[in-house]
């Protein structure tokens, strides 16, 4: 059978934005274009292939710590030029790479006259150059490199923001993150922190003999969380596919297959609202361990997060605005039912459903009309009345079964499941279960979810019969946990917007 391939250009019917001033030569500075032509007319390549960079700037700065020994030492490095200051026969500038900045001095007499004139007239702030020169200190004590050789490595054609005004517009920083990183060193540090965070998560788990796996991003059946998916179409297979909303069901298949400690650091995609703590494309880690339950997963989560915070910041305390949050163990653990009593003064089971509706209306809690049971009202009122009060790290455990289709029934409390969520700064940071491993119960839960979906609940889960079949071969008792890396980076950096910790957050097109 021959499958018809859809070769339609996906952009063919999409209105294209007005790119005037944003792309091509229209975005480039006229004076920089003229200088580019000047460089070429000198027979120089403004974009050479390679430069032997012997030292990072941070290593050069370390040499100044023993200046008596290293004065006059010849160094060779490269970076981007900032803040060029011309003083007749002397030109000062700052040279920066990913690790630091150092002042450079280009002096007539240290370079051939022709090269000095090229630097003076054709090199700009924003250009990337390589330099060789000797370490010295100015009369004002400024650590500097006296340049004896330079190479233009990349001629910039776009002007950097002014020194004193910088790049302040938040939306521009998000849309042009590359420019944000060029001019705002403190923003670069956020993503250095994020990179180290992910490395430390891997180290923590691999030290405990967990294995890292990769599971599909494109899936025929989406699941593992209650969320709306992104849909696409596979031309060759002739079928719809969904972008992953969670890796959970595939990772549990791996535990069925015999791997007892697994994790994945992954991108997930949820077609939902965008706000200060939600982005449709986000990063998380999911961890599963056989022969463990949700108590063990709380222990693992607490150890992981508290160790990460201390390793990356040198302290167990983080600052969120005016709030100081202490992540030193032990953390508070309280059931959802008791948390509602403690923080909102509400005993959920002492009220009728009609009473709970009135309470929801009085507190302007949305979607109360969807709640039909005490369990559903417990989850709804907890979210509306308690979550934002959980500033210090707090595990909320024992959730109602109605909104937890993948968690194991509670061993003692009917109507509840063994599930927890970690809250910090009023945000959900992690979610974990004693994993449901009864295939018949899982099928029943999925079918209940599917009924909700068909009645209009677009976040309800679908039935994954292959996953049910996998459970039929036997999933050992298993504990699982998912942790949001974006929000954890926000906590470590003291930031209140998720867009500040995602390099290229989703933004509405500028049509």
Swiss-Prot record:
Its Enzyme Commission number(s) read 6.1.1.6
* Residues the entry annotates as binding Mg(2+) 1: 421, 428
Family membership: Belongs to the class-II aminoacyl-tRNA synthetase family.
Q: What is its main location?
A: cytoplasm
Q: Which GO terms describe its molecular function?
A: ATP binding; lysine-tRNA ligase activity; magnesium ion binding; tRNA binding
Cross-referenced CDD domains: LysRS_core, LysRS_N
Which residue ranges are recorded for the region named Disordered?
1-22
PANTHER family in the record: LYSINE--TRNA LIGASE, CHLOROPLASTIC_MITOCHONDRIAL, LYSYL-TRNA SYNTHETASE
Chain positions recorded as Mg(2+) 2 binding sites: 428
Q: What is this protein called?
A: Lysine--tRNA ligase 2
One cellular component term (GO) for this entry is: cytosol
Which biological process terms from the Gene Ontology are attached to this UniProt entry? lysyl-tRNA aminoacylation
Q: Which reaction does it catalyse?
A: tRNA(Lys) + L-lysine + ATP = L-lysyl-tRNA(Lys) + AMP + diphosphate
InterPro entries membership: Aa-tRNA-synt_II, aa-tRNA-synth_II, aa-tRNA-synth_II/BPL/LPL, Lys-tRNA-ligase_II, Lys-tRNA-ligase_II_N, Lys-tRNA-synth_II_C, NA-bd_OB-fold, NA-bd_OB_tRNA
User: Kind of enzyme, top EC level?
Assistant: ligase
Copy out the cofactor comment. Binds 3 Mg(2+) ions per subunit.
Its subunit composition reads:
Homodimer.
Q: Which UniProt keywords apply?
A: Aminoacyl-tRNA synthetase, ATP-binding, Cytoplasm, Ligase, Magnesium, Metal-binding, Nucleotide-binding, Protein biosynthesis
Localization per record: Cytoplasm
């Amino acid at each position: 059978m021959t499958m018809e391939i859809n070769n339609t250009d996906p952009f063919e019917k999409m209105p294209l934005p007005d790119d005037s001033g944003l792309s091509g030569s229209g975005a480039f500075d006229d004076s920089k274009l003229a200088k580019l032509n000047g460089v070429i007319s000198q027979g120089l390549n403004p974009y050479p292939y390679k430069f032997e960079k012997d030292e990072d700037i941070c290593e050069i700065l370390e040499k100044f710590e023993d200046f008596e020994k290293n004065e006059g030492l010849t160094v060779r490095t490269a970076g981007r030029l900032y803040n060029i200051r011309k003083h007749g026969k002397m030109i000062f500038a700052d040279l920066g790479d990913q690790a630091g900045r150092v002042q450079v001095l280009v002096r007539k007499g240290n370079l051939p006259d022709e090269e000095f004139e090229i630097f003076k007239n054709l090199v700009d702030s924003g250009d990337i150059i390589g330099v060789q020169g000797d370490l010295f200190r100015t009369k004002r004590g400024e650590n500097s490199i006296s340049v004896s050789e330079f190479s233009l490595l990349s001629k910039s054609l776009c002007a950097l923001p002014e020194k004193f005004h910088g790049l302040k517009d938040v939306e521009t920083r998000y849309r042009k993150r590359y420019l944000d990183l060029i001019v705002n060193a403190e923003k670069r540090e956020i993503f250095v922190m994020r990179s180290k965070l992910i490395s430390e998560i891997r180290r923590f788990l691999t030290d405990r003999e967990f294995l890292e796996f990769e599971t599909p991003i494109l899936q025929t059946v989406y699941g593992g969380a209650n969320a709306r998916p992104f849909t696409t179409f596979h031309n060759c297979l002739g079928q719809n596919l969904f972008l992953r909303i969670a890796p959970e069901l595939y990772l549990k298949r791996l535990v069925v297959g015999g791997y007892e400690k697994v994790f994945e650091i992954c991108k997930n995609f949820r077609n939902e609202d965008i706000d200060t703590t939600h982005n449709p494309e986000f990063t998380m880690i999911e961890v599963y361990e056989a022969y463990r339950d949700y108590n063990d997963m709380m222990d693992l989560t607490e150890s992981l997060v508290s160790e990460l915070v201390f390793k990356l910041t040198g302290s167990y305390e983080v600052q969120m605005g005016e709030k100081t949050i202490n992540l030193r163990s032990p953390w508070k653990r309280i059931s959802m039912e008791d948390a509602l009593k403690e923080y909102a003064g509400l005993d959920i089971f002492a009220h009728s459903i009609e009473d709970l509706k009135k309470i929801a209306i009085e507190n302007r809690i949305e979607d109360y009309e969807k709640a039909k049971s005490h369990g559903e009202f417990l989850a709804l009122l907890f979210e509306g009345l308690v979550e934002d009060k959980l500033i210090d790290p707090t595990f909320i455990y024992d959730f109602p079964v109605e909104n937890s289709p993948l968690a194991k029934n509670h061993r003692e409390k009917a109507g509840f499941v063994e599930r927890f969520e970690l809250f910090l700064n009023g945000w959900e940071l992690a979610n974990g279960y004693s994993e449901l491993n009864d295939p018949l119960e899982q099928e029943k839960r999925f079918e209940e979810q599917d009924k909700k979906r068909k009645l209009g609940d677009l976040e309800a889960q679908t039935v994954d019969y292959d996953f049910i079949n996998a459970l039929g071969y036997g999933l050992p008792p298993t504990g699982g946990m998912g942790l949001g890396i974006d929000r954890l980076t926000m906590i470590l950096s003291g930031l209140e917007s998720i867009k500040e910790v995602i390099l290229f957050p989703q933004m509405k097109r500028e049509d």
